From Swiss-Prot:
Source species: Bacillus subtilis (strain 168)
Pfam families attached to this UniProt entry: DUF3243
InterPro entries associated with the record: DUF3243, YmfJ/YflH_sf
Gene giving rise to this polypeptide: yflH
Protein name as it appears in the record: Uncharacterized protein YflH
Superkingdom, natural source: Bacteria
Taxonomic classification: Bacteria, Bacillati, Bacillota, Bacilli, Bacillales
Length: 104
């Protein structure tokens, strides 16, 4: 699957997510980390390597930055970092987020 197809798939999943579920995930940073951890584990079970997991996390970060308002201080910080980062830095930030939830 190429990056554009992956982007469309992730955006479709986020758009299809019921509003209250998405709100619950985004209102609390611990909930967000739990959601991200589930997605990372799901990807690993499907055989995705770390590079693919990071690219997926970066696509999710792009989606959230464009379509969702931060609902807590941690999300505000992530959005501000995302807004000033170039593509390479966004990938590094996504890598750190994957590493963060993978160690929990």
């Amino acid at each position: 699957m190429n990056r554009d197809q992956e982007k469309i798939q992730i955006e479709n999943e986020m758009n299809a997510m019921h509003g209250t579920i998405k709100e619950d995930i985004l209102k609390d940073f611990e909930e967000f980390k739990g959601y991200l951890k589930k997605q990372v584990n799901r990807g690993k079970k499907l055989g995705l390597d770390d590079g693919k997991l990071v690219k997926s996390a970066a696509i999710l970060g792009d989606y959230l930055a464009k379509h969702e308002e931060p609902q807590n201080g941690e999300e505000m910080l992530l959005q501000e970092l995302w807004s000033v980062a170039d593509e390479d830095e966004k990938e590094h930030l996504a890598q750190l987020l994957v590493k963060l939830v993978d160690k929990q």
